[in-house]
Amino acid sequence: MLPSTIQTLTLFLTSGGVLLSLYVSASLSYLLYSDILLKFSTTKITAPTMSLDCANISNVQAVNRSATKEMTFLLPEPEWTYPRLSCQGSTFQKALLISPHRFGEARGNSAPLIIREPFIACGPKECKHFALTHYAAQPGGYYNGTRKDRNKLRHLISVKLGKIPTVENSIFHMAAWSGSACHDGREWTYIGVDGPDSNALIKIKYGEAYTDTYHSYANNILRTQESACNCIGGDCYLMITDGSASGISKCRFLKIREGRIIKEIFPTGRVEHTEECTCGFASNKTIECACRDNSYTAKRPFVKLNVETDTAEIRLMCTETYLDTPRPDDGSITGPCESNGDKGLGGIKGGFVHQRMASKIGRWYSRTMSKTERMGMELYVKYDGDPWTDSDALAPSGVMVSMKEPGWYSFGFEIKDKKCDVPCIGIEMVHDGGKETWHSAATAIYCLMGSGQLLWDTVTGVDMAL
């Protein structure tokens, strides 16, 4: 009798051969979208050659001596991502702390990288924790200069969310002292900016390929948002700005598809200074961004970008809860919504994320607890309304970082569950050792989950004197 493996081949692979086609039918159900076409790609699988040199050759006359056959499968391509309704919940809770320098005694490949400007971006299957490193680790001998924003050594790196950004764990994507990244459902788009202040360059990487560039237009520190860009239907939108840190800096948006710039968008409205925007989808039609004005006001410039018309407008947030740092007392700025008020010089990137519900929308924001220093971080929310015209105070929703702990940049992102999106806010907690020692950051993460009240704040647990 033939061996069982040869019996199987006898049944399915005759001398004429059989083409096996597997048709996969899939339905991607988005709560905000329908009629999404599922495309297919052809995959060929070749079975290994099996020699049939048996003792009794008469037993195998019906079987070809070579059993190599090609089987063609029609497999679904990954689909473009679209915003969906948020997962259920009414409060944020402490989700995760990434505090690399708690492991600062490790050396070699296990040493934590010295980083700043962390942010998180998510694809359908994973989230990545990004940051800008100084190409140095702690402990190490290259601490000098790690407090500077821009130099020739800085790189955009990432690890899988939940991993510690060590030398060994980190992927180095490109040289960059400003960065962003996003996933379109099929592939990652990475953004890095570096070069001299007077002629910086945006570089785009799609998957593993470097695909496009964009040159400085004001010759004054071209830079991007330091948080995730936003993709819908294969189009990804990136905020950039170029101009003085204490004067005019007009932003633009780049529309990017598969790693290549296909359109520039020039916002209208209150455009004097807009930088470091944190952006997300209010709906399948509109991207909204809460940004930083480092020159004129402690109010946040608020962008509405229509992805159907590729137009954008900027106005100041009207709320009496001022979100920048430094800032005046809440409610102290008089006049119309576009009034700048005082204490507008200087600023900080702010956290912002949407909670999309069937009957309403929630907008969640973060700001430092201190009005003058980068200390502490508190969460606020406002349901429905228009940030351009609503002057009401935002509702405080809990302390994420106490006044005793550093609260620097913050950002928003969304984790993709099976049928909904989970809104989250991340907080950069900087270990500021001054110019003489290392200068790096931990990341605290809070996400929408369950009900009740936000229960506990985050500490880094790092003592720089150790």
From Swiss-Prot:
- Mapped to this chain, the residue ranges on the Virion surface side of the membrane are 32-466
Chain residue ranges for the region called Head of neuraminidase: 89-466
Question: Can you tell me which residues are glycosylated?
Answer: 56, 64, 144, 284
Annotated substrate binding sites: 116, 150, 275-276, 292, 374
**Entry keyword Disulfide bond:** yes
Q: Which residues lie on this side of the membrane: Intravirion?
A: 1-8
Reaction it catalyzes: Hydrolysis of alpha-(2->3)-, alpha-(2->6)-, alpha-(2->8)- glycosidic linkages of terminal sialic acid residues in oligosaccharides, glycoproteins, glycolipids, colominic acid and synthetic substrates
Family of the protein in this entry: Belongs to the glycosyl hydrolase 34 family.
Name used for this protein in its record: Neuraminidase
Write the gene name.
Answer: NA
